[in-house]
Amino acid sequence: MMGCTLMGVTVVGMMASFPHVQERVKNWEDEVAHSQAVTDALLSIEGTKVLSDYPRRHSLTRVDTRGSFDTVAQEHKKRGYFLSSELKKRGITGIIPGSTRVWKYNTFGLTTKQIQHVGEAFVEVARENGLNII
């Protein structure tokens, strides 16, 4: 283990962090359910597709919104920045400004209340911009 300093330090670091990782994944089913809730809200917006496996088994999700938010961005005065701007007004940050085509989000560590807020915010933005909700 300590023959190569670079590899040894990496292994020791991983061993030291393992208890923290174990603690973080104790509620993995809840984390996946949270991801599924936001994914379902996004899928209720006509033209939105999930590019990750579905139903969700992970908290990181890749979505394609070229058929929904990107169509709004083409006509909107803020172009692709409208989505991040609208979400920021609602207290949601982290979406890369200008991203309305294909992007990722991660729901890990959010509370149920925060998950509901995020899902409702996406649907609200879609509704305000004339997108159909299925």
Language model features by range: what are they?
Residues 1-67:
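Active-site C-terminal subdomain of aminotransferase-like
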Residues 40-133:
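Conserved C-terminal alpha-helix-loop-beta "cap" of PLP-dependent enzymes
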